[in-house]
């Protein structure tokens, strides 16, 4: 089994490509379920944001995994493979593990240290758990990714003076206008990005805020938080005639503001310039708006320069975060190595349970007068003896599994306890990694042999 990441991000693909390969939040569950049915894919999680769309997968073979995931993306987005392939990035095995941890910590973001991506990774993780598209390996990997991401923000100041794409949009507006105190800001979209834009604008002493959203109640809720005005979407053209700055992030599939709409609104502006920032993927604002006199349009890729100016301190802090990531990688790989020992431990327990069962049957034949209570008591104590006797061998097996030549050492371990045949049967049962630990824990519960050490 191998861990594989396939996708595009802001470094590998321009926005024109990223917006073609972007999953809407309500598509993720269906997409993960469909990908689960692809050949070679054992587990999968999809993370899709404005700056990246990445498929994380456990595959049985790397080359077939790459092929079927690429095929899935091509078919889902109706894009020929030859158009898609030049922009795809691939991470395999250790590099894939490191990449996920860097993403969760915000080190791979356009804005180093931003916190949004951790929430998006966690959200995709929860969706995958709910849809059962992941199993043993990704449950542990993504749990550790979320943990190291949270540790990053708790133990460093990498998120201080918060910077995000929406914050960068505000910074760009300030550079162009100087002060925002007398400016009318129009926020199009009341989702997370719109909310962040409003929060970043709130401390700038802005003159007026108008929020427009497809759902008026959401627009009103956001506007009320910042003493602004809410309007419905059918009032957009009128609002464009009044605003000085537009920050747009609706998540719509088509352009929300067209060149024709802006031309009509522009007749009422009397030559006043309009600064527009499109932080949505796919884009909300027609790129042709840049052709209009007095309109200054920037999209998410244009914000990279603004973002860069705020990041030097975060880069220095990132060196400390790299140490967190290195430790997390070591911890996960140690855990991953122990997966191979699960069938061995199961076989050892099965053999011990068989001996205990045979012993109990022999006792009951020789002592037929035993009461039900006495039989239960004997069974409990014989299992207790087994647990105590197995403790050290199981700990040793786990230590062996973490060593470089673990395969040979575990083979010798199985020979010593004469459990090779049973371990082979246990391994056959657990070839689908999504069932390995679950089956092991289920067997423990059934037999009454308690876990001796935490998994």
Curated annotation (Swiss-Prot):
Annotated family: Belongs to the glutamyl-tRNA reductase family.
One Gene Ontology term from the biological process aspect of the record: protoporphyrinogen IX biosynthetic process from glutamate
Site (Important for activity): 99
UniProt subunit comment: Homodimer.
Domain comment quoted from the record: Possesses an unusual extended V-shaped dimeric structure with each monomer consisting of three distinct domains arranged along a curved 'spinal' alpha-helix. The N-terminal catalytic domain specifically recognizes the glutamate moiety of the substrate. The second domain is the NADPH-binding domain, and the third C-terminal domain is responsible for dimerization.
EC number(s) on file: 1.2.1.70
Enzyme category, top tier: oxidoreductase
Pathway as given in its UniProt record: Porphyrin-containing compound metabolism; protoporphyrin-IX biosynthesis; 5-aminolevulinate from L-glutamyl-tRNA(Glu): step 1/2
Additional information: During catalysis, the active site Cys acts as a nucleophile attacking the alpha-carbonyl group of tRNA-bound glutamate with the formation of a thioester intermediate between enzyme and glutamate, and the concomitant release of tRNA(Glu). The thioester intermediate is finally reduced by direct hydride transfer from NADPH, to form the product GSA.
Pfam families cross-referenced by the UniProt entry: GlutR_dimer, GlutR_N, Shikimate_DH
Keywords noted in UniProt: NADP, Oxidoreductase, Porphyrin biosynthesis
SUPFAM superfamilies for the chain: Glutamyl tRNA-reductase catalytic, N-terminal domain, Glutamyl tRNA-reductase dimerization domain, NAD(P)-binding Rossmann-fold domains
Residues forming the catalytic site: 50
Species of the source: Bacillus velezensis (strain DSM 23117 / BGSC 10A6 / LMG 26770 / FZB42) (Bacillus amyloliquefaciens subsp. plantarum)
UniProt keyword NADP present: yes
Residue sites binding substrate per the record: 49-52, 109, 114-116, 120
Full protein name: Glutamyl-tRNA reductase
Role according to the record: Catalyzes the NADPH-dependent reduction of glutamyl-tRNA(Glu) to glutamate 1-semialdehyde (GSA).
Positions with a binding annotation for NADP(+): 189-194
Catalyzed chemical reaction(s): (S)-4-amino-5-oxopentanoate + tRNA(Glu) + NADP(+) = L-glutamyl-tRNA(Glu) + NADPH + H(+)
Top-rank taxon: Bacteria
Molecular function per GO: glutamyl-tRNA reductase activity; NADP binding
